[in-house]
Amino acid sequence: MAAQRPLTIALVAGETSGDILGAGLIRALKARVPNARFVGVAGPRMQAEGCEAWYEMEELAVMGIVEVLGRLRRLLHIRADLTRRFTELKPDVFVGIDAPDFNITLEGNLKKKGIKTIHYVSPSVWAWRQKRVFKIGRSTHMVLAFLPFEKAFYDKFNVPCRFIGHTMADAMPLDPDKNAARDVLGIPHDAHCLALLPGSRGAEVEMLSADFLKTAQLLRQRYPDLEVVVPLVNAKRREQFEKIKAEVAPDLAVHLLDGMAREAMIASDAALLASGTAALECMLAKCPMVVGYRMKPFTFWLAKRLVKTEYVSLPNLLAGRELVKELLQEECEPQKLAEALLPLLANGKTSHAMHDTFRELHQQIRCNADEQAADAVLELAQ
């Protein structure tokens, strides 16, 4: 009698964040089904957990229209080859991890062949290009969503979606140790401290750094002991920021950090940051914040017409109200930014109320996402 085939899960991750999610999912599945087989497109973390890589993740990790066009033939070849090989393999479940432009079409191809499909990490369909929800619904048996309002959006369109909580909320403590973070960064425990996070993209650093630095100068007039920490994602962004600082605020003393954004947030009394995942991380660090953002005028005009949400920052979307001040476009200027930050640096009623709400929101999305994702995969595999 032939031995029963082990549970077989196919996965495709297209970037580092997906590799981290995939590794966590594989770990949770292996704890329950030790002989399970994992195959697909994997990064080093997924491979270390035992995923057999038919293609390296770097093959899919292309950013920008020019880069994608240059690699389009190769990407289409990989997707066609994966469709063929997964169809032959007939895995119990296929999990596309993020990378929606690549994965959702692949999921649709496989669903037509009778393979059960999951899309792990919802694209921002609730914010813009909402009609994508129909393609997602046709292509997947289940979407795994990090945030509760994402599930509420899919429910409106009768697309099966499971809220699993956010892996970042699982990884960060409910009550971070501010003094320990200050010790790491060399910040005195009794000083006022402001974190500036002008974004991870070159265009963001270019558009925001000067105003963020001028804001810090204004705040130092009010708080002469103000320590300013500026974590930058890589050497390129650091060089770019240093050049702008030399022109705008050469005499402003700041702590420039290579990475270490999380430590900077935990150590600080307040943060001024571009929107995006940084705002969620700052919320989980329990650091009161102001969001400042500016784009090229035409890009902003277009965004206002495309984006369907009332707020841009994740803390506000989670709270369903303006918990965090958002100063966008012409409002993103030093005087207004400084006025919004002053009550947060005072460390009084305003910042305490924000801190308490951040903690409540953290608890809402701290659900052991790896285990929840594994539950969803195993339920679909039955």
Swiss-Prot record:
EC number(s) given by UniProt: 2.4.1.182
Family annotation (InterPro entries): Glyco_trans_19
Keyword Lipid biosynthesis: yes
EC category name: transferase
Pathway: Glycolipid biosynthesis; lipid IV(A) biosynthesis; lipid IV(A) from (3R)-3-hydroxytetradecanoyl-[acyl-carrier-protein] and UDP-N-acetyl-alpha-D-glucosamine: step 5/6
Any Pfam family the entry gives: LpxB
GO terms classed as biological process: lipid A biosynthetic process
Disulfide-bond pairs as recorded: none
Keywords: Glycosyltransferase, Lipid A biosynthesis, Lipid biosynthesis, Lipid metabolism, Transferase
Biological role: Condensation of UDP-2,3-diacylglucosamine and 2,3-diacylglucosamine-1-phosphate to form lipid A disaccharide, a precursor of lipid A, a phosphorylated glycolipid that anchors the lipopolysaccharide to the outer membrane of the cell.
Family, per entry: Belongs to the LpxB family.
Entries under NCBIfam families matching the protein: lpxB
Name of the protein in its database record: Lipid-A-disaccharide synthase
